[in-house]
Amino acid sequence: MVISTNELAALTVVLLATGVLFYANSTRRAPLPPGPRGLPLLGNLFQFDVMRPYPQYLKWAQKYGPVFSVKLGGQRIIVLNSSEAADELLATRSKLYSSRESPHVGFDLVSDQQRMLFMPYGREWKIARKNVHSLLGPGPSKQMGKTQDLESRVMLHDLLCHGETSITEEFVEGPRGEVPERHWFSIVRRYTTSVVMMLVYGRRIHRIVGNPELHKVYDLMSNFTHVSQPGRYMVDALPVLRWLPDMLAPWRAEGRKMHKREMDFWGKLFSDSRTAFLNGTGLNGFVQSYLRARTEAGLEDLPGNGATEDAAGWMRDKLITYTAVTIVEAGSDTTSTGVFSFVLLMLSNPDALQRAKEEMDAVVGSSRMPDWEDEDRLPWLTACIKETLRRAPPAPLGIPHKVDEDDVYNGYLIPKGSTVIGNIWAIHMDPVRYPDPTAFKPERFYNPDGKLNWASGPDAHNRDHYIFGWGRRFCSGKYLAEASMFIVLSRLIWGFDFYAASDPQTGKARLPDVSDVDTFTDGLVTAPKIYPVGFKPRSEKHAEMIKASYRDVQNDWQSMGLAGDER
């Protein structure tokens, strides 16, 4: 919680108004879900770390059951801690629960109300969602298979060249999770980001070192996940503070400054795409394709926010810009975080890793790389990926929903306007659904018959994990993320013996403790902090195949009119 002196002074002014709301809430007809006792007016604001609430939310879930409530100032939060409760409210009753509790700083100021992630459930969100789904739906996402294939081959080559660099050199993560450009994390990030940049802008990320564009993408995403965390700013807990003048509202200038930073980067990518389209030199990314269709409809110039009021609902320039941002965020962050967690968990569980190698050798062998058709034939690897996403979900509390009307669940009132959180962390740590939940056990999901049930499946009650959310707000990038993780992780297992740094005193592997929350970053999205890993080809034959494949890929880039890799 960030509270300035001005905010503390202003707090005195608004306590009376907040008291009225407090009294109104206390006299409702039906009981609220149980929860921890809070302070008058301020509620539970200071009873947990608002930047990392999921550990405390798990404790409260274990104490209060499937549903509990907390109060952050004037903001009522209902937390759903079982798959049954989350499925019933967020999926079955999605008509009531499909809106968002939009963070004032993160949505109104930083995003100028144009970021689809936090848009209220309404016309503009539906327009943006329709366009995103046209790119990331189950059918269209398969068209990205070639890009994922080629970019994953580049990543293998980068890891081959990287070797032990992350072990032999000293790297320090920045205060906001900034990753050094020569660390192996940056190699993975280049892969995931280049895939979605191709999809959105028709351009590659073809360089790692000395490439500020790659690192700016993650800098902006990290900043957004921090400023959008519920409770991060007092103004989110006490909305009446929004009426304060600028001199008493330092968050306002901060949010506007962050918006300018975003537009300097994302806005420039849009402008560059627009210029390339107008000059006839643009490639067929989402932005260029949309501008082409809009121009053909007679709307070449359409500045501003939102969409046109006619039935066609053409997106204006800033909504296109932020819809493109949504696709980049949906397709890159989850995938890279999943790869980092997978490597950490597999190294922490060497028996599972060895079994994955044995399966790979039996199914694929050393004469070729694994490919898409191998997915059904690698059930243990698939189980390891699923268990990774269960044990280390990238967003432990998902993205908060908002209920549009009073509702009742199991005799408890869910008041209109409440923030409603699907507590993914508590569901994934449920010992009934997942016995011994803190253990890494891929056998939970192992199906040797090859019949897979990914989290993107239609049956909400029998999904393997819940990292992609619920209902109408189900993550648009789920199909792209699952495919990107499979192809790159299968090839990582096939091509490399990867290993942790050794303790010079004991000779044992030095790995972060996956059970320690400090192993992970905080904010809306949590990823492992950087840790050292070495990569060694499993044989000289594997190494030569990786090198030859990389050379072939450069020819592919050239034939596609794309930038070749610079190393």
UniProtKB/Swiss-Prot annotation:
GO terms for cellular component: membrane. It is a single-pass membrane protein. Heme binds at residue 475. Pathway: Secondary metabolite biosynthesis. Disulfide bonds: none annotated. GO terms for molecular function: heme binding; iron ion binding; monooxygenase activity; oxidoreductase activity, acting on paired donors, with incorporation or reduction of molecular oxygen. SUPFAM superfamilies: Cytochrome P450. It is an enzyme of class 1 (oxidoreductase). Its EC number is 1.-.-.-. It holds the Pfam family p450. Glycans are attached at residues 25, 81, 223, 279. The keyword Glycoprotein applies. The chain crosses the membrane at residues 7-24. Its cofactor is heme. It is found in: Membrane. InterPro entries: Cyt_P450 (IPR001128), Cyt_P450_E_grp-I (IPR002401), Cyt_P450_sf (IPR036396), Cytochrome_P450_fung (IPR050364). Keywords: Glycoprotein, Heme, Iron, Membrane, Metal-binding, Monooxygenase, Oxidoreductase, Transmembrane, Transmembrane helix. Cytochrome P450 monooxygenase that is able to use 4-ethoxybenzoic acid as a substrate for oxidation. Belongs to the cytochrome P450 family. This is Cytochrome P450 monooxygenase 69. The gene is CYP069.
